[in-house]
Amino acid sequence: MIFATAVAILTSVFPPQERGKAIGINTGAVYTGLSLGPLGGGILTQNLGWRSVFIVNGMFGFFALAVALIYLKGEWADAKGEKFDYVGSTIYASMLLFLIYGFSEFSLPFMLLGIILAAIFVAYENRLEQPVFAVKLLLSNLTFSLSSLAALLNYAATFAVGFLMSLYLQYIKGFDAQTAGFILVSQPAVMAIFAPVAGWISDRIEPRIVASAGMGVTTLSLILFASIDSNTAVSNVIAYLMLLGFGIALFSSPNTNAIMSSVERKFFGIASATVATMRLVGQSLSMALVMLVFSLMIGRVNITPEYYGEFIECSRVAFTIFAALCFFGIFASLGRGKIRG
């Protein structure tokens, strides 16, 4: 709910010429949390036990709630009075559930059921004047649809990198989990630094240009990841992670800016929710692709020294697929057109 509404509120509050900067700061804050979360969680777990993680998270939640109640005085219910689409919401939730579970478990019946529900959902939503998901918007707004596709491809190509590199650093390089975590933090740290800058730039340059450049940098980093082996220096791994973080930062804020700037004010909530949906589905697809590659190449086995070579080969295949997805994402990003006259 937070991810689905935060960008909509920011877009409603800030004028178009400052929208990218605001979204960039928000994105940078998200990535800062991603950087500090694993480190803070590790410190808390090691010193105070795993329950302390949930206690501290609850405290942060209450603090955020207090800040929102005190300082967020306005209201942005631009679609107030419209009927809520309960039927469409139920179909939508069921569709995502079956698709994500089907791809995660490689269950053909669940995948087919998810696809059938997707077709029903599109047909049903296309008939409504007040749908939960603006299918007509996707079909009629090229900038919105291609920007959403670019986001989906970017998340699908990058989310599982942290998972693969965590295993690589622990199994192949022999680091403990805490050290591997410190190394992996280099990616979101770079993202936190450059996301606000990219958002600011997208207020002055067409977002599609900035986002496409970011997609290109991300593609390059994934190609470099596809070249790793057991002898790759850790310094190279850190450099690849930082390059990936820079590419994602350069893409994310401008792409979100393009999505939010391509729709009318009354669709801000739907557009923001679409960004969150693309993130969720893309991340799920990313992990599903990794699991599929490993399942087809080595099956369900424990990663022991005798399988280290196969693990590296599977990882390289996965990175190659991710690079291809990101490469196609460049064209989706470039094809969206201008958002400014």
Which residues does each PLM region occupy?
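Transmembrane alpha-helical segments of integral membrane proteins
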Residues: A68-Y71, G299-T304
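Helix-loop-helix hairpins in multi-pass membrane proteins, especially solute transporters
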Residues: M1-V87, R265
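Residue-level hotspots within transmembrane alpha-helices of multi-pass secondary transporters
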Residues: T5, S35, L39, A66, ...
